[in-house]
Swiss-Prot record:
InterPro entries noted in UniProt: A-amylase/branching_C, Branching_enzy, GlgB, GlgB_N, GlgB_N_E_set_prok, Glyco_hydro_13_cat_dom, Glyco_hydro_13_N, Glyco_hydro_b
Enzyme class: transferase
Protein name: 1,4-alpha-glucan branching enzyme GlgB
NCBIfam families for the chain: branching_enzym, PRK05402.1, PRK12313.1
N-terminal signal peptide: none
Species, as recorded: Prochlorococcus marinus (strain NATL2A)
Active-site residue list: D431, E484
Subunit structure: Monomer.
General function of this protein: Catalyzes the formation of the alpha-1,6-glucosidic linkages in glycogen by scission of a 1,4-alpha-linked oligosaccharide from growing alpha-1,4-glucan chains and the subsequent attachment of the oligosaccharide to the alpha-1,6 position.
Amino acid sequence: MTVSILLDSLKDDGQRLSECRHESPFSILGPQPFKDKWIIRIWMPEASQVELVTQQTKIKLQNPNHEWIFEGVLEKDPGTDYQIKVNRGGIEHVQHDPWSFRKEWMGEIDRHLFAEGNHHHIWRKMGAHLTEIDKKKGVMFCLWAPHAKSVSVIGDLNSWDGRHHPMQKRLGGIWELFIPGLSEGDLYKYEIRTEKGHCYEKADPYGFQHEVRPAKSSVISKIDSFQWSDQSWISNRDNRDPLEQPISVYEMHLGSWMHASSDDPFINSNGEHRAPVPAADMKPGSRLLTYKELANKVIPYVKERGFTHIELMPISEHPFDGSWGYQVTGWYAPTSRFGSPDEFRAFVDSCHKEGIGIILDWVPGHFPKDQHGLAYFDGSHLYEHSDPRVGEHKEWGTLIFNYSRNEVRNFLVANLIFWFDQFHIDGIRVDAVASMLYKDYLRPEGEWIPNEDGGNENFEAVRFLQQANHVLFQHFPGALSIAEESTTWTGVTKPTDMDGLGFNLKWNMGWMHDMLDYFEIDPWFRQFNQNNITFSICYNFTENFMLALSHDEVVHGKSHLLHKMPGDDWQKYANTRALLAYMWTHPGKKTIFMGMEFGQRQEWNVWDDLQWDLLNYEPHKGIQKLVDDLNNLYKREPALWRNDFDEYGFQWIDCDDNKNSVISFMRREKTDGEWLVIVANFTPQNHSNYRIGVPVDGFYEEIFNTDASQYGGSNLGNMGGKSTDLYNIHGYENSIDLCLPPLSVLVLKHKSKKN
């Protein structure tokens, strides 16, 4: 029997639903108790007929109150055990009723933790989740948009029409809806209607996959289904102090390391052909490599070079190639430019199999204004500050996260944990930390607001960074958290319980600037700038420093490393070799940008390949061989890394010979351990009898020489090493008389006697 129950309010409800203004569809749709029976109401825009089908009966539903609200009466609550047969435009289909699945997805504890900013795994609730409810497969959508008037799921399932699938608003500004029948790979967005009536289409902030640019939709994607094989790697990583290990990082941008021809087959991990992703309009005829192809090419290359880690410039989804990945719109998704999330997982897994760690650039300092992203998300400044003096980087054209809002901090902190949990990464480098710490960063007077103490420190950002690092090391004690922080802010690498920011490494920007300034000087004038090459040791042990020659130093007219060097080609190569060797022997972990390892000549261009053809020339092969051997020497000699952050690990022999631009020092492992002697000559002048003091007599084997012929040098040296003489110099009774080749660095190792 069909009974129509006329409620005056239903006309208004139907009108609000049809205009996407209803925040509580569960209050009228689905099974509703009425006296001793149950009314089933179905919202079905543009349907001409709807039938309710159960195991026992089939009922033709009526629409007496609104043309798109169909209803009928059952004796008992059917729960979710019914289907609806819909006729729309003469086409019939059968589906389950989304509004029959009424149980809350986000429980009270989840909401509480999220509201206080402490739900470290919030991505397991937010976003689009393939799941099963009452044995019915589908997708649960969950979104935080507290100021929205209504939210709908739109996609191919409803022809991108927001009237079809309005979501239910829960406590805490959470919106939920389970849609049966959706599957992996389906596209979706959220249509958000604001209190002012404006309508925005937004990608899912917690989406696990997004379309390839320039498309902007989110993609339903599985998590937790990948079969990892790196359990031993993860266990070893989390049970040792990463700072007590050699760390040599190859920074790279996946989209410009190498391209393939558009004509080359483009095959996914299942062996299926698919459409190639063009590199860019600026590189016609080329396509991006896939994660699988990159694994096959990058991993053997990096392993042969001897690097311990790969640092990937941001791979979180981003719409504009020219941002290099630093303007993120898809925080919980690796970019689809190179393949699927599981294909990126396979890339990381393959790296771990070969003993290579993965560090990701993470950008919690700002986000772009793209309409489908976080900006003005629910009609309010939800993720950003409303005042541009606090909430906008005008020079970058980006917005700044409101770190004072618990849910925003939660979004970011959980995102950090997400990458370690879901993709097994080993570390992060946080970009542009100084822009977060200072309220007046890149701002003229009058365009920033002082803190409550009248200063320029951003206390909210400080607390966020402390929370992020504290939570990270709680969950992943062997992780790396690296700060790109360009100022003298104190305590960047101090633990949070000592009021530090909690990072365990900081890029040494001062060292980088001093080194490049020094090496760009004509060698004959370096004698007047000796402080540049020695000053870093004065503050080296105030933080845990990483020495970095990054992508930022080879763009925007700065030229690549080789071309920064003065002199003719021979001197350019020799200077490059000397700088790299000094970097590898100086205290601190190491990072260089792709191309530096073989002497790239052109500036880095995000749309182009590296100049691989240069490896057809001996000087470039020599630089590559030098980097290989530096990495192997570095890993083989604990004196070069074990005491990077302990003053005992470094001691000058002589840093005052500015006339000859020569420095000498020792790297020491431990009190009774081995040490190395390093001597650097930063002029083209050969010194055939250069004496330095050494602490112990014996034989000093020359174990590395940047002037070796295999590196492209002149092959001057010390015939394998030198024995000490009883000659007092530099405060030592014993000394060795060395041949210092031009523009060279020597590494010598003490032995009790010559073999």
